[in-house]
Amino acid sequence: MKTLQFFFLFCCWKAICCNSCELTNITIAIEKEECRFCISINTTWCAGYCYTRDLVYKDPARPKIQKTCTFKELVYETVRVPGCAHHADSLYTYPVATQCHCGKCDSDSTDCTVRGLGPSYCSFGEMKE
């Protein structure tokens, strides 16, 4: 019985501590309409699991906030997109997460949908590295 209890506690600890919300490296596709192609860049963003629960009984007095792994702090970096027309603005600014936490998704600055386009989506056919 003690082995079963230890195993249960170990699984809880692993779920909470080991799969936490943390910075991770990702590759995103960036595009400028004036340039008509995409390039991929490496950046950091937040990924992982946050403890959350969904009650069976919906209490109107309790806020309905599901915590998600999101950025706590971020900076912006700028890259020049090659191959743009001379009159076009070839600079593209993108966010880089520097610190993560489990919190409410801010829909003013983040795509909080279940099925977003994804970081590698490119609306143009040509992708350059």
From Swiss-Prot:
Coiled coil: none annotated. It comes from Homo sapiens. Keywords: Disease variant, Disulfide bond, Glycoprotein, Hormone, Hypogonadotropic hypogonadism, Pharmaceutical, Secreted, Signal. Belongs to the glycoprotein hormones subunit beta family. GO terms for biological process: female gamete generation; female pregnancy; follicle-stimulating hormone signaling pathway; G protein-coupled receptor signaling pathway; positive regulation of bone resorption; positive regulation of cell migration; positive regulation of cell population proliferation; positive regulation of gene expression. Glycans are attached at N25, N42. It is found in: Secreted. One of its GO terms (cellular component) is extracellular region. This is Follitropin subunit beta.
